[in-house]
């Protein structure tokens, strides 16, 4: 295997921050020490990009365990105009206009996931000799972390291998606006910034058929970090972020409106999901389980390792999940630009 130091970072690679660039071939128990060497009791673990996705996407756990799909019926009225029900009082009986209703199912495909861990007697003895590392618990943690990070990424981006498992940012049914935002918001002049604020909510309200306003604006993390600059030289104490939050809270009449930075919205982190090179994607939406939801029919289960020969032990972690299904599509809107 080539040394990992020779592999440059590329768009679309897993979001992670390792303890430096470590080659798999360098991992092991043996390294040189001398009589004056101290091995610390505490180890430093690898870090990964983490975001509490359930705070941004409604999640339901436990529904549909060990099944293949969940269907949710969407109901519709077909009632015609209000005035079609007006009856004359000076003439004889007339036919009464009727209303009808209907349903249409929306399907959430359920994916079953399982991954194993293994260790043997010799590996245990070597780990014990290192004095400060529990190889078994480390493998269990790695398996659970793989599940957690996988759900996190899927909730926003979906699965590349299965179009029936979309993420919040990758639903093909959602309207994509490519004119309202054409660059980083944090780089706009005061005049262009004011125009953007004026146009954004209007575009969403039109897209929702004038029925709803959003409560969340998710933007690329890089842009979010740049919004702490002053909105203009005349107002140096007011940041662009403060101005936006105040304006959108007033426009939506919702004091809980949130602007959030999400790394998966950055073009470098979503390549291959909806475009080969990705794009900077902004999304206005409602954090409402009737608007969108991710199901986790079976949360992570870690089976204890078992052995058939008292030398090798094998264990399996498993779970089930769906993508982020958007039930009220007009209540979600994407705004794109690509570098």
Feature annotation, model-predicted:
Residues 1-31, 76-95, 197-203:
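Solvent-exposed, charged interface segments at domain starts and junctions
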Residues 2-57, 228-339:
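Sequence/fold signature of self-assembling virion shell proteins
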Residues 34-115:
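Assembly/oligomerization interface modules of large self-assembling protein complexes
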Residues 113-119, 219, 317:
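Hydrophobic side chains in beta-strands
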Residues 114-195:
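Alpha-helical scaffold segments that mediate packing/assembly in large oligomeric complexes
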Residues 169-240:
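Extended, solvent-exposed, turn-rich assembly/linker loops in the middle of proteins
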């Amino acid at each position: 295997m080539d040394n990992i130091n020779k592999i440059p970072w590329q768009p679309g690679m897993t979001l992670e921050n390792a303890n430096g660039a470590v080659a798999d071939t360098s991992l092991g128990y043996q390294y040189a020490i001398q009589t004056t060497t101290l091995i610390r009791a505490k180890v430093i673990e690898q870090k990964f990009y983490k975001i509490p996705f359930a705070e941004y996407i409604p999640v339901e756990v436990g529904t549909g365990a060990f099944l293949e799909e969940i269907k949710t019926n969407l109901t519709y009225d077909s009632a015609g105009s209000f005035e079609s029900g007006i009856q004359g009082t000076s003439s004889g009986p007339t036919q009464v206009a009727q209303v009808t209703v209907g349903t249409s199912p929306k399907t959430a495909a359920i994916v079953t996931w399982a991954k194993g861990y293994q260790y043997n007697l010799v590996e245990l003895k070597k780990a014990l000799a290192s004095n400060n590392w529990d190889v078994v618990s480390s493998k269990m943690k790695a398996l659970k972390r793989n599940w957690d990070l996988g759900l996190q990424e899927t909730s926003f981006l979906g699965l590349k291998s299965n179009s029936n498992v979309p993420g919040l940012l990758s639903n093909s049914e959602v309207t994509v606006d490519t004119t309202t935002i054409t660059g980083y918001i944090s780089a706009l002049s005061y005049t262009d910034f004011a125009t953007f604020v004026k146009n954004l909510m209007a575009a969403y309200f039109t897209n929702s058929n004038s029925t709803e306003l959003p409560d969340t604006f998710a933007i690329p993390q890089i842009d979010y970090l740049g919004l702490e600059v002053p909105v203009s030289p005349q107002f140096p104490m007011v940041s662009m972020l403060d101005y936006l939050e105040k304006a959108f809270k007033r426009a939506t009449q919702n004091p809980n409106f949130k602007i959030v930075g999400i790394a998966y919205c950055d073009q470098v982190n979503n390549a291959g999901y909806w475009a080969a090179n990705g794009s900077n994607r902004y999304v206005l939406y409602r954090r409402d389980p009737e608007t969108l939801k991710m199901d986790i029919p079976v949360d992570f289960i870690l089976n204890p390792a078992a052995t058939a020969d008292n030398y090798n032990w094998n264990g399996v972690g498993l779970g089930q999940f769906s993508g982020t299904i958007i039930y009220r599509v007009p209540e979600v809107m994407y705004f794109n630009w690509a570098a």
